[in-house]
């Protein structure tokens, strides 16, 4: 657990959460996401045809990106505290109930996240493995919470 946290945190230097950088890094994630995964834009009502330029100008994606970045930092920082980590996973699902997300996306997100980090700089093999482990545990808890809500789950 400690190695997973250590390696995830080390790679987060590529996605800083400082006051000066959080908003832009969050927008950068969604620009990367919309450019590389246009099929997933359908989950963002009103932004189904957004380009990276549209994301850059969007207050909505500034807020979404900042929130996503904060969530990823919280997950990495709490990975060695299983109760807090899993509670945050459940709360994440609770915030997304009713959005009709494909349950496979809760695991798939992490490969997109690693690819985003790689676009910002070098990510080591140990760091990739750490994100995969974190994503696996995250997904496991998310699938249990989806089931609790009676939603499709894997």
From Swiss-Prot:
Molecular-function GO terms, alphabetical:
heme binding; iron ion binding; oxygen binding; oxygen carrier activity
- Keyword Lipid biosynthesis assigned: no
* InterPro entries for the chain: Globin (IPR000971), Globin-like_sf (IPR009050), Globin/Proto (IPR012292), Globin_nematode (IPR012085), Mb-like_M (IPR044399)
Q: Which GO terms describe its cellular component?
A: cytoplasm
Similarity-based family? Belongs to the globin family.
What Gene3D superfamilies does the database record attribute to this sequence?
Globins
**Domain of life (superkingdom):** Eukaryota
Q: Which organism is it from?
A: Nippostrongylus brasiliensis
- The name this protein carries in UniProt is Myoglobin
Q: Which residues form the Globin domain?
A: 1-147
């Amino acid at each position: 657990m400690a190695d997973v946290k250590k390696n995830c945190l080390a790679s987060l230097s590529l996605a800083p959460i400082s006051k000066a950088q959080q908003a832009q890094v969050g927008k950068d994630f969604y620009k990367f996401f919309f450019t590389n995964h246009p099929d997933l834009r359908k989950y963002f009502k009103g932004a189904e045809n957004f380009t990276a330029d549209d994301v850059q100008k969007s207050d909505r994606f500034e807020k979404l990106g900042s929130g996503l970045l904060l969530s990823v930092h919280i997950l990495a920082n709490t990975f060695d505290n299983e109760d807090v980590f899993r509670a945050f996973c459940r709360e994440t699902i609770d915030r997304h109930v009713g959005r009709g997300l494909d349950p496979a996306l809760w695991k798939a997100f992490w490969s997109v996240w690693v690819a985003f980090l790689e676009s910002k700089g070098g990510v080591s093999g140990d760091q990739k493995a750490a994100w995969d482990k974190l994503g696996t545990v995250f997904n496991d808890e998310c699938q249990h919470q989806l089931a609790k809500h009676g939603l499709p789950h894997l």
